[in-house]
From Swiss-Prot:
It comes from Trichodesmium erythraeum (strain IMS101). Disulfide bonds: none annotated. This is Large ribosomal subunit protein bL20. PROSITE patterns: RIBOSOMAL_L20 (PS00937). InterPro entries: Ribosomal_bL20, RIBOSOMAL_L20_CS, Ribosomal_protein_bL20_C. Coiled coil: none annotated. Belongs to the bacterial ribosomal protein bL20 family. The gene is rplT. GO terms for cellular component: ribonucleoprotein complex; ribosome. Binds directly to 23S ribosomal RNA and is necessary for the in vitro assembly process of the 50S ribosomal subunit. It is not involved in the protein synthesizing functions of that subunit. One of its GO terms (biological process) is translation. HAMAP family: Ribosomal_bL20 (MF_00382). PANTHER family: 39S RIBOSOMAL PROTEIN L20 (PTHR10986). Pfam families: Ribosomal_L20. GO terms for molecular function: rRNA binding; structural constituent of ribosome.
Length: 118
């Protein structure tokens, strides 16, 4: 059976991991074994948090909409329900932007939604 020499392949693999570990502190950026563990953990966290970011932003938008709606005397759930009845199709991101940057326009949306209460 011929001898398998993996010098180039192994070196490339290690260099790739150490390149990904650039910026980590201490041994985590210098020693392959430790760097490999840190890189794997960093990639896991990045994968998880890309999904979590979507949930976090949705929660933030809902909180902002709820706060602005309560100032106008309506709860978030009432607002969303009334908007669906009135066929107002504005997503939560845009509603939150309106609530923060243009309260007058947000008040108009609330007014239109409250007309469809019945």
């Amino acid at each position: 059976m011929p001898r398998v020499k993996r010098g180039n392949v192994a070196r490339k693999r290690r260099k790739k991991i150490l390149k990904l570990a650039k910026g980590f502190r201490g041994a985590q950026s210098r020693l392959f074994k430790v760097a490999n563990q840190r890189v794997m953990q960093a990639l896991r966290n990045a994968y998880r948090d890309r999904r979590k970011r979507k949930r976090d932003f949705r929660r933030l938008w809902i909180t902002r909409i709820n706060a602005a709606a309560r100032q106008q005397g309506m709860t978030y759930s009432q607002l969303i329900c009334n908007m669906k009845r009135a066929n107002i199709a504005i997503n939560r991101k845009m509603l939150a932007q309106l609530a923060v940057l243009n309260p007058e326009a947000f008040a108009k949306v609330l007014e239109l939604a409250s007309l469809a209460k019945k």
